[in-house]
Design a protein with these regions (language model features):
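Residue-level detector of alpha-helix initiation sites
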Residues: 10-11, 90-92, 110, 135, ...
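Conserved acidic residues
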Residues: 10, 70-75, 134, 188-189
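FAD-site-proximal beta/loop scaffold in flavoenzymes
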Residues: 101-124, 195-197, 203-268
Length: 377
């Protein structure tokens, strides 16, 4: 019988299994993951919650095998009807300073449970130190503050995430932490202890230290299998490993040849759809304009497109004079990216405009009264 063995229970692995079920794949499907029941990762930093994609009954009903195991080696497919799909995701970067092991990470259900236990066991107002102010660090700092903690956020930059949000909005969002009672510090951590950190020559005491300084693709299994690895498992446009066409890679661990690695939820979903098409021998759905989101301090932040393609930016202010949207334009004036706060339907509208290489006027982009439907007309 044909088979698909998926290694990894994040969004990419689960989405692939669901696609295959919906398309009535005739073979066996199984998912192996050391953490057991597949669950969504973004809620970990947003709320410390573990949200399974589906109950165990869904897998039982559709004949999808669930194996709780840490796969460190396996046999490569021996038939063109059998597939191995690596959806192993990423692993947190270690804080490379003396005592760096004292910092907790926030990358798994076990991490979230451990951090929740510390927050819940302490007195109201306990001190929390967050190292790294990217997506995970900023979201967790907001979550910890809402739980009643005293939070200090250490960043190496005054504008974390400028490369994906645009410089202007990145600066505003980082500065906004102070408006919500979070102390921010720009600098480098040089040493950690069980309950303290040294940064910029000063000691910062804390009952909880969390490091969120980025992630790396989890390629240990791929390396063991002899697959080509270069900032992720290198794949073609059909998600096939360049080293073995019966091995696919999807999600954060995969990188299409000659392209940067995409590391967002939506990209993982699209990888899964492409992998299902490869396995089923059907036409793949068209890739959409990149999109991701983040939640902090009860604000919904969205980015569409790619700011690395922007030659210039245009900002739109709200009634209070704060930046609400940053639009990125290429050298020809075509819209290539945008980031926004509580943008509503604007994100969908901008995605459509980017896909069409639209060239809205500067006046339209700046005008807060120009809504999603009018933009680009």
């Amino acid at each position: 019988m044909p088979s698909v063995h998926i290694i990894g229970g994040g969004v990419a692995g689960y989405a692939l299994a669901r696609h295959l079920v919906q398309q009535q794949y005739a073979g066996s499907i199984k998912i192996s993951d050391a953490q057991g029941l597949p669950y969504d990762r973004p809620p970990l930093s947003k709320s410390l919650q573990v949200e399974p994609f589906a109950p165990v009954s869904w897998y039982q009903h559709h004949g999808v095998g669930l194996i709780q195991e840490d796969v460190q080696s396996l046999q490569l497919p021996q038939s063109a009807d059998d597939w191995v799909v690596l959806a192993t995701g990423t692993t947190p970067k270690a804080l490379d300073v003396p005592g760096g092991h004292h910092a907790l990470s926030l990358h798994s259900a076990a991490d979230a449970a451990r951090i929740s236990d510390v927050l819940e066991s302490g007195m109201f107002g306990q001190r929390v130190l967050v190292i790294g102010a990217g997506l995970v660090g900023a979201e967790f700092a907001s979550t910890a503050k809402m739980s009643g903690a005293q939070v200090t956020l250490i960043s190496s930059s005054d504008a974390p995430l400028a490369h994906v949000l645009g410089q202007e909005l990145a600066e505003q969002l980082h500065a906004d932490h102070a408006n919500h009672g979070i102390a921010t510090l720009t600098g480098a951590v040089t040493e950690l202890g069980p309950n303290y950190a040294l940064a910029n020559g000063q000691r910062h005491d804390a009952e909880l230290i969390v490091a969120a300084i980025g992630v790396e693709p989890e390629t240990a299994l791929a390396g063991h299998l002899g697959l080509e690895v270069d900032d992720g498992i290198v794949v073609d446009s059909q998600q096939r490993s360049l080293s073995n066409p019966q091995v696919l890679a999807i999600g954060d661990v995969a990188r299409e040849e000659n392209q940067p690695r995409a590391v967002h939820w939506e990209a993982a979903m699209e990888d899964a759809a492409q992998a299902a098409a490869t396995i089923m021998g059907t036409a793949a759905p068209k890739r959409s304009v990149p999109w991701f989101w983040s939640d902090r301090h009860e604000m919904h932040v969205e980015t569409v497109g790619d700011f690395s393609q922007a030659a210039s930016t245009v900002t739109r202010l709200n009634r209070r004079g704060k930046i609400q949207t940053v639009f990125g334009l290429d050298a020809k004036g075509s819209l290539v990216s945008a980031s926004m706060i509580d943008g509503g339907l604007m994100a969908k509208a901008v995605r459509r405009l980017i896909a069409k290489s639209a060239t809205p006027s500067i006046e339209q982009l700046k005008d807060p009264l120009t809504g999603p439907r009018e933009l680009g007309r």
